[in-house]
């Protein structure tokens, strides 16, 4: 086979001088004829750390079989994962966003070092998805992403968020120890990613809309023949990308990112999509900013009635056809650009033409002229509390404005203790700070406190502010990613208990009701609380990471 299809592997295996390389490869299963084939790296995030990833080894095998069937030589390798659901609410959660960078770095390292001509990545837990695609963008070799798939519902349509909210219900006394144990024991029935339009399903959908996975890859259950077939088809499809030299940056254009943003909004997806799409765009050399989310949000309605803000699970969306019919609706209404190329080698429009519409009697996805919300639930806020931006998730059910007195905590643990000891009341603005990319370090998610508030029945009566993140499972009046963060002396560091805070999702403003002079006086006397010297990867991350408004990345432009 020509060197054009073996642009990288030919340097590893061709010629007398590469006999040692070939000798090593023979030991891992290469035959003489395999050296003439394009080599395809298959990056598996298989792990028994989390149910999100416990089945991915089987999907990696299916992808390898597909790649074998079309004349390439697959090589499976592994990378790490961290479980958000397990580490949530603990110091371990500091490593979650850090793992995005470690995964991207490790995939880049193996592919660059081994000279693979193409790349298939498989991800399950939240940070896997952006990490895999960030690595693809950096390497810019023919690549496809395969989503590990969504989990089946638990008993009585429960999921992981049901368990987090049950903690608040238990604290409030509305459920017993036995009832809590029952929810804990039956909410997670097996493999797959968390079952609402939380971060994993949001990012899988965004990547499909971006063009980096096959149609409907985002909308299959983890344990299903459909997901095994999707993985096999990805293995088959990689050869077409190699043959035609279609690379990630050919696919991930500015217009493709705009498609991904629009689909995330239509699905009612996670705030984490903002952070992750900014990070992917950074690696793809695409100029994307918070203002693009605001601009696209003004013209894009929320159409899907999915958890956490809505009623339905991902498994129920899968039953009616996944996100492909949604994208058909959006294409017909000119809410996405159908001319963008995808990993099939065809345009989005050509891909969508092969699929039908939703059943007429379905109630999960609304019509464009009768949306759940006429514009985006993801609001980009600015003001004297967030001069460089913040990201709010406001479905409209909570109202569009909130004004209240601040209750300030300098860590998630302190805030959680305050909530469970009934120190938070209706009308409060709960501020959790020093949880940003540099402050935590690692920008922890605040699912434990928000779920506890929901469980106590205060979800529509309390607003949350943080320089950290919110889980895709969070709902309520929440504002995160506040920039500059407290660790860097941002205005959020200057808030005191009892300060009046105003949030307006109509004007996209977030303000502390103090004069510039008062803020300046507080800034003059501000001293950053002493943070532990963490050592290791957390210190490395703190020294490199950019702000949330820039995607919290660790590589230079």
Model-derived features with residue positions:
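Glycine-rich, highly charged phosphate/nucleotide-binding loops
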Residues: 96-105
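A short, small-residue-rich loop immediately preceding and capping a beta-strand
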Residues: 111-132, 144-147
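Catalytic or ion-coupling anion/metal-binding cores of large enzyme and transporter domains
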Residues: 2-54, 59-78, 85-86, 91-96, ...
């Amino acid at each position: 086979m020509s060197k054009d299809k073996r642009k990288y592997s030919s340097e590893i295996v061709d010629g007398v001088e590469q006999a040692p390389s070939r000798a090593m490869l023979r030991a891992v299963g290469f035959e003489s004829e395999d050296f003439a084939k394009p080599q395809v790296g298959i990056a598996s995030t298989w792990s028994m750390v989390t149910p999100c990833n416990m089945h991915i080894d089987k999907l990696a095998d299916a992808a390898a079989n597909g790649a074998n069937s079309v004349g390439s030589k697959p090589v499976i390798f592994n990378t790490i994962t961290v479980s958000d659901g397990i580490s949530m609410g603990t110091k371990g959660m500091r490593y979650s966003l850090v793992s995005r960078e470690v995964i991207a770095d490790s995939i880049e390292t193996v592919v660059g070092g081994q000279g693979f001509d193409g790349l298939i990545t498989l991800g399950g837990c939240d940070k896997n998805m952006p990490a895999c695609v960030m690595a693809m963008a950096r390497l810019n070799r023919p690549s496809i992403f395969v989503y590990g798939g969504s989990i089946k519902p638990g008993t009585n349509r429960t999921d992981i968020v049901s368990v987090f909210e049950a903690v608040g219900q238990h604290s409030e006394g509305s459920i017993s120890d036995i009832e809590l144990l029952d929810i804990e024991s039956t909410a997670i029935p097996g493999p797959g990613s968390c079952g609402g339009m939380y971060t994993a399903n949001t990012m899988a959908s965004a990547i499909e809309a971006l063009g980096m996975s096959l149609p409907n890859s985002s909308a299959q259950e983890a344990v299903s023949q459909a997901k095994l077939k999707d993985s096999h088809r990805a293995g088959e499809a990689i050869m077409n990308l190699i043959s035609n030299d279609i690379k990630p940056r050919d696919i991930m254009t500015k217009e493709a990112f705009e498609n991904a943003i629009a689909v995330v909004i239509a699905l009612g997806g996670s705030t984490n999509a903002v952070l992750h799409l900014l990070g992917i765009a950074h690696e793809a050399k695409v100029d994307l900013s918070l203002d693009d989310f605001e601009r696209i949000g003004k013209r894009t309605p929320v159409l899907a009635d999915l958890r956490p803000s809505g009623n339905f699970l991902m498994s129920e969306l899968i039953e009616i056809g996944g996100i492909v019919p949604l994208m058909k609706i959006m294409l017909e209404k000119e809410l996405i650009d159908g001319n963008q190329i995808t990993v099939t080698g065809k345009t989005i429009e050509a891909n969508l033409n092969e699929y039908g519409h939703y059943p007429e009697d379905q109630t999960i996805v609304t019509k464009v002229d009768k949306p759940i919300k006429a514009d985006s639930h993801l609001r980009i806020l600015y003001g004297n509390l967030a001069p460089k931006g913040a990201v709010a998730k406001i479905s409209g059910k909570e109202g569009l404005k909130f004004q209240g007195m601040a209750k300030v905590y300098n860590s998630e643990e302190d805030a959680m203790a305050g909530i469970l000891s009934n120190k938070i009341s209706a009308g409060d603005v709960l501020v959790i700070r020093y949880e940003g990319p540099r402050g935590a370090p690692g920008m922890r998610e605040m699912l434990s406190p928000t779920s506890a508030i929901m469980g106590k029945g205060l979800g529509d009566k309390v607003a949350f502010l943080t320089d950290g993140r919110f889980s895709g499972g969070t709902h309520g009046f929440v504002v995160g990613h506040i920039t500059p963060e407290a660790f860097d002396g941002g205005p959020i560091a200057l808030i005191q208990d009892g300060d009046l805070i105003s949030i307006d999702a109509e004007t996209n403003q977030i303000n502390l009701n103090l004069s510039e002079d008062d803020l300046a006086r507080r800034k003059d006397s501000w001293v950053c609380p002493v943070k532990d010297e963490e050592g290791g990867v957390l210190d490395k991350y703190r020294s490199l990471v950019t702000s949330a408004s820039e995607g919290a990345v660790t590589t230079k432009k």
